[in-house]
Amino acid sequence: MHEPGPPRVTSVGRSVELAPRDPDPDGTYQWRLLDAPAARRDDDASRHERGDEDGCDDEKGGVGASTGQSERTHTVLVPGETTRADDPVVHLDPDAPGLYVLELAAPDGTHRQRVRVFPDERRETTIRVPTSALPVPDDDVDRVSVMWRHNDRLLARDRPERVGDEWVLQTAVPPGRHDVGFLANDDRATSHHHTHEVPGPGRPRLSLDTSVVPGGDDRAETPTERDTNGPVLVVDADVDVPPTAGCDPSDVDVEFFVDDRDADPESAARTEARAEAQRLTVPVDTLSDLCRGDEETNAGLRIHAVPRTARHGVMATVTVRPTDCVDTDAPVRATDPHAPPAWADSPTIYEVYVRSFAGDTLPTTFAEIERRVPYVESLGVDVLWLTPVLASPTDHGYHVTDYDETATDLGSRQAFESLVDACHDAEIRVVFDLVINHTSRDHPAFQMHAAGVPAYRDHYRRTDGAFDVTDTGWAILDSDDMPEYYFDWGRIPNLNFDSPTVRRWLLDVVDQWAAVVDGFRADVAWGISHGFWKEVADRVPDDLLLLDETLPHDPFYGGGEFHLHYDTSLYEVLHDIGAGDAPADAVSDALDRAEWLGFDDPGAQMRYVENHDEPRYRAEHGDEAARAAAAVTFTLPGSPMVYAGQERGNETTRGPFRWHDGDTALTEFHRELSRVREAEPLLRADGVRFDGAAAEVEVRHGDPERVTAYERRASDAVADSRSDSTPDRRLVVINFADEPATVAVPDELERDLFAGERRVGESLVVDTVAVLA
């Protein structure tokens, strides 16, 4: 089936890629805009001109009158960049809020796609950087390039204006904290990094709960429940808002959508019309016509919901099937189609840089890594993440030259699969580094593309040659153009996902390696469209873990795409604490920021202090701070990640693993962190509180700025903050200082689980971490 996937949500100013799934490169595809809201008048006030500070304003951006593409001056349906006569992939660039309805004509028939567009979130802002901030003498600067997520890190596109002694960029971006690079002479080595804050509300978030209730109850909340003779499916949105939202979760509107793949337009509209506030009700007997096969082939009814205030949140989904579709005693079976694998409940992850793990003498191969699996097992980890293992001319492996073959210096595919089997024998899952945003320019596909072979003309994205910052002297295919690349990565040109041939190729790559490994870490996930990742998530086995590299972390990569995300908020805060630029209590700021961004599940974050792209924490901030930072990652919700060598005292990012001269005490410290986390379910639960017992912790001797404390409870206990009961809890105390801290703790806490169940008195000496019960 070439259906284009679930309903999509976006806002004015943010385009959406739409594409057929499972594409046939030889097929013909054509998109058509069937319905759209009336185009915005020139005098309409856009959101970024109003500057709302209240997160729950009254203006909802309704659908309004509809119009077609021919009646508007702005082209909202932009064809993909290919040389094909048809348009398999298009980009919806909405100019007004409301509902857009599209049709895809494909070889297997026509398919309907809806896109809900919310009002423009962007706000006019001015970014100013003193000329003296750039690490280059002012007289030597003849141009400056801005590099940030809002231009996809494409250099030489956005240029600030020189105004007096400042470089000034006028732009419009959504509310939030934005990291901006100002690059003198387009050179990343001469960049100045600036943080710019745009005021405004955070995003609401939701999860979906389902139940089945009897119909015909006059006391029920909705007409469907009162008027239906028979059981009624109830889908409730559990909504939350950031602490600074200025409104109650009950004030948040929720829009429900029935998946167009599962119901005809009339049935979908009837079902959606039953929604009231934050609840959707559906008579169970209306679900019976959904059964189209057995449990494996029947998709059921997919119901989506999105919260909206001044900004919209991430879409959540539930799949429901009536009893005649599946074997169950309940009238309806409801599942989360995007739930993480059962084995991936807060797993501890160990990243190995595959070309230095054997140490400073032996070359690292799959066989040598396999011989060291007992060591990895001794650390108590659940997942082994290997940096790229495919053919590449580089040590780091991110310049792929063959997606079908492993790197010859590492070993054969058979040797790789032997390593995977050895890990499985040790109950360790293996995550594969999936690098499909780009290839090496030495890949035969790019070489044929650059040489003008027609079959490869659309394989890579092209752009204006004036944007080149590498002085490469690219082969020109059309009007002084060049291949597109991010940053100054001229050796890894971007693949063109507008091409169905490329999509087919890379989906086959996904299929091939999904049959071998247990998960994918998606390199440069932010460079690839949401639509493609949604297809990957629906395509791979349910027990395959998906981890995204999105910098900074973005909740929209969680809506039916990835299970785990790089927690860049905590990473940045931990480094600020280590450098002395923030107090230890700033750990709470990182969690608050994730909520503000719109992340619903704190367990969906990968917590880390370093990786193969970043400096070693210990080298930058010292041993004691490094221990404390690691302890934070192991005592918060989510998945702690240890980068190989972190536990041995390595101070070079990709240098040889320290086997014979490593820090054994530090290794034991990490083993103990893993042991305590495994033994204490509350350390893996979702609930974190920085008030209550945590606020009672008093530093009597030591530096209070270097000490933080937080409670770990089950998430429902955290939510019930007004309860008089004292639920089971653990109190975590972390000390980032070089010297021990003496702290007073609540009387009812008696044992330190991190120190061999040592008894706790009125006060406690904390070297690095204490976990109190």
Task: For each feature predicted by the language model, list its residue ranges.
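Solvent-exposed segments in extracellular or luminal domains encompassing
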Residues: 83-99, 278-298
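Aromatic-rich carbohydrate-binding modules that target alpha-glucans
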Residues: 120-175, 185-200, 262-277
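C-terminal beta-strand-rich structural cap/linker in extracellular carbohydrate-active enzymes
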Residues: 216, 757-773
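An acidic-aromatic substrate-binding cleft motif
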Residues: 325-372, 379
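Substrate-binding/active-site clefts of carbohydrate-active enzymes
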Residues: 343, 355-358, 389-411, 416, ...
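Active-site-proximal helices and loops of the catalytic beta/alpha 8
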Residues: 511, 518-519, 523-605, 651-672, ...
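Aromatic/acidic polysaccharide-binding cleft in carbohydrate-active enzymes
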Residues: 606-664
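Carbohydrate-binding surface patches
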Residues: 695-746
